[in-house]
Amino acid sequence: MVRYVPRFADGQKVKLAWPLAVFRLNHIFWPLDPSTGKWGRYLDKVLAVAMSLVFMQHNDAELRYLRFEASNRNLDAFLTGMPTYLILVEAQFRSLHILLHFEKLQKFLEIFYANIYIDPRKEPEMFRKVDGKMIINRLVSAMYGAVISLYLIAPVFSIINQSKDFLYSMIFPFDSDPLYIFVPLLLTNVWVGIVIDTMMFGETNLLCELIVHLNGSYMLLKRDLQLAIEKILVARDRPHMAKQLKVLITKTLRKNVALNQFGQQLEAQYTVRVFIMFAFAAGLLCALSFKAYTNPMANYIYAIWFGAKTVELLSLGQIGSDLAFTTDSLSTMYYLTHWEQILQYSTNPSENLRLLKLINLAIEMNSKPFYVTGLKYFRVSLQAGLKILQASFSYFTFLTSMQRRQMSN
């Protein structure tokens, strides 16, 4: 059972950054390699079903805890279990969508790494520029790694202190104290934690990488067009200048259309999961900020988690805005092809007319910027990230006012 190995068009393996190398080991969110045999695929499905059942069990146990604390009107204890429950439900929705589109994801990634991913061997400068935009996301991945590490240390202290505490706030509908029941449940805690944590930083890293490399491909398209136009102007082959520019723009448009089509595939692949991610973000940030605010020393895990989620949203939003800016400038790119100079020097009136019609078509085709969206409701942009933070702050002030009211009573 081998997970999909990204490769360039020539078959060479792509060297993945460490967050994606870790994410590739996630048996729920990373597809299988096409070479995987029948029994390997069967085993993978069994693991996926087992993981889904464990998710459901954790959902039930954590929800029981939340209901118990809500009935006791214990806001602080209630919000202790809320972040892990929200991220668990989010993971359930996202994993379900992934499992229903597993084969499509593998084919999509195959297209990306073969055609869109910027090859550092051919374009080292552009690759460094694009890869530099991923540094913040890798820092976020390290912060998420710190969060799950702190959660996973808990079993060690549990053994030392001879207490039977689970990693998350849970109440089971049966007696979980016997060792033969407690240990398997604790191991499922660890399994869930690793799968969800790698999902949190891994899928966001993958989405950011898809967007920045698509953006970089558009930038290469613009650079290559400008360099080719300069050659036409320098050569000044007057009878053929208009035709040369027309052929160049036609070739560029074909690449442009291919990139646009990949953008639509990216939208189709991620629109549901982006919606789920953004829909849960405000509530999650609210709960995390409240716990970090009420007792920062005791709840440092929540503070780190809050910081990671905030930076993740802003970084993803900025990357989405960069792509929108680049695609919005494509119409200007075609307008600034020095067609006035070409027409001035050209001695072929019929080709001049065809050239003008083609430029008008190119401008019209690229009249709107491209955004990755969440079911057309959320846009992956910096503005959307700031709005989510604003909403979470509003919820946070509401919770703090509730806490003050409880304390006064």
UniProtKB/Swiss-Prot annotation:
Residues 57-64, 161-177, 295-302, 401-409 are extracellular. Keywords: Cell membrane, Glycoprotein, Membrane, Olfaction, Receptor, Sensory transduction, Transducer, Transmembrane, Transmembrane helix. One of its GO terms (biological process) is detection of chemical stimulus involved in sensory perception of smell. It is found in: Cell membrane. InterPro entries: 7tm6_olfct_rcpt. It comes from the Eukaryota. It is a multi-pass membrane protein. Belongs to the insect chemoreceptor superfamily. Heteromeric odorant receptor channel (TC 1.A.69) family. Or1a subfamily. This is Odorant receptor 35a. It comes from Drosophila melanogaster. The gene is Or35a.
